């Protein structure tokens, strides 16, 4: 009889009232319950007064009530049944509407973010393409300008070369003027021939190279046949043999270039003299000598192989960027931009 009366009394009480009575029986205050459940005191007060905060979703409200019931030792199922009877509409309608509005706002925000991202991406791609095109166009214009300059210089040099007359008939070599005395002396005995050719070492090597054929002809023509037969080695004494002409020593600062394709090139030495300026064809070779350091401009670095002081010059950084190579080769063979 008493149990049924208590059960009827509990059913008459609301969810908030039952929680408040259980809290008071345990001697707990609203502040203590709020601290244990990590809630605000105002939230605990609204639950006990059966108020549902407008900014609080029904899912969270049910979770708070379940935690509160466990704290005060009340069966959770009884409280949830009573809560559904008190506010069935709010649990059915309010939550879906709020979820729909949140999803709509999130979708709108994501759309704006995606649009802005694509806009930034297009701007970056456009700027990169414009920069590349301007750089490529500037390089092509520079190569064209340098090729035109070299063509103009070659044409002017060819015109000057055609206007200069050749004076080979009027110029006389000092060594050739001494030929008549040599022929007169060679008519004597064979013992006088070394005396005539003895002054030859004092003559310049370049003059010896020119005079030696004429002197050889004069000696062989003027000397009688028996005299030529009496020589031990059977050869007439040539001035070039007695002069001791030495081959020139290779310049240590020589610049050697081999071309694997057509390439425009300009080389200037330390004095500002242009050693070469023009177009080199495929499979061509170029050997230049001047005063170091050398300044080089190469239109197609991938088409040329350079050796300086017997060592190869690295052009890989210009080949990777596909740009006109401007470098300086100093005495230590350290190319610099």
Curated annotation (Swiss-Prot):
It is found in: Cell inner membrane. Residues 19-71 form the HTH cro/C1-type domain. It holds the Pfam family RodZ_C. Residues 145-167, 208-218 have a biased composition (Polar residues). Residues 30-49 bind DNA. One of its GO terms (biological process) is regulation of cell shape. GO terms for cellular component: plasma membrane. Residues 168-207, 219-235 have a biased composition (Low complexity). Residues 1-111 are cytoplasmic. One of its GO terms (molecular function) is DNA binding. Keywords: Cell inner membrane, Cell membrane, Cell shape, DNA-binding, Membrane, Signal-anchor, Transmembrane, Transmembrane helix. It is a single-pass type II membrane protein. Residues 133-337 are periplasmic. The helix-turn-helix (HTH) motif in the cytoplasmic domain of the N-terminus is involved in the formation of spirals to maintain the rigid rod shape. As this protein is anchored in the cytoplasmic membrane, the HTH motif may contribute to protein-protein interactions to form the RodZ helix, which is localized beneath the cytoplasmic membrane. The C-terminal domain may be critical for determination of the rod shape by probably interacting with enzymes required for synthesis of the peptidoglycan layer, including PBPs in the periplasm. Cytoskeletal protein that is involved in cell-shape control through regulation of the length of the long axis. This is Cytoskeleton protein RodZ. It comes from Shigella boydii serotype 4 (strain Sb227). The gene is rodZ.
């Amino acid at each position: 009889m008493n149990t049924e009366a208590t059960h009827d009394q509990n059913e008459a009480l609301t969810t908030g009232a039952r929680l408040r009575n259980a809290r008071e029986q345990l001697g707990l205050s609203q502040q203590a319950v709020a601290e244990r459940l990590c809630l605000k005191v105002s939230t605990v007060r609204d639950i006990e007064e059966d108020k549902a905060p407008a900014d609080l979703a029904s899912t969270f409200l049910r979770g708070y009530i379940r935690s509160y019931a466990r704290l005060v030792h009340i069966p959770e199922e009884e409280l949830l049944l009573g809560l559904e009877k008190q506010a069935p509409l709010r649990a059915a309608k309010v939550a879906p509407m709020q979820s729909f509005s949140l999803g709509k706002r999130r979708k709108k925000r994501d759309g704006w973010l995606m649009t802005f991202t694509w806009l930034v991406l297009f701007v970056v791609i456009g700027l990169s393409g414009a920069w590349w095109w301007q750089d490529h166009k500037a390089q092509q214009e520079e190569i064209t300008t340098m090729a035109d300059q070299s063509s103009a210089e070659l044409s002017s040099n060819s015109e000057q070369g055609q206007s200069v007359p050749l004076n080979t008939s009027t110029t006389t070599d000092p060594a050739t003027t001494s030929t008549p005395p040599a022929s007169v002396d060679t008519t004597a005995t064979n013992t006088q021939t070394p005396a005539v050719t003895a002054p030859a070492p004092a003559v310049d090597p370049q003059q010896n190279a020119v005079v030696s054929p004429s002197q050889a002809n004069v000696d062989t023509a003027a000397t009688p046949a028996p005299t030529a037969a009496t020589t031990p080695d059977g050869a007439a004494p040539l001035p070039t043999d007695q002069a001791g002409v030495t081959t020139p020593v290779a310049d240590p600062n020589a610049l050697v270039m081999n071309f694997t394709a057509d390439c425009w090139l300009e080389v200037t030495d330390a004095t500002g003299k242009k050693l070469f300026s023009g177009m080199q064809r495929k499979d061509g070779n170029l050997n230049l000598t001047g005063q170091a350091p050398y300044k080089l401009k190469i239109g197609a670095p991938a088409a040329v192989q350079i050796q300086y002081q017997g060592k190869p010059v690295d052009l890989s950084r210009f080949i990777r960027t596909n740009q006109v190579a401007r470098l300086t080769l100093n005495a230590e063979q350290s190319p610099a931009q």
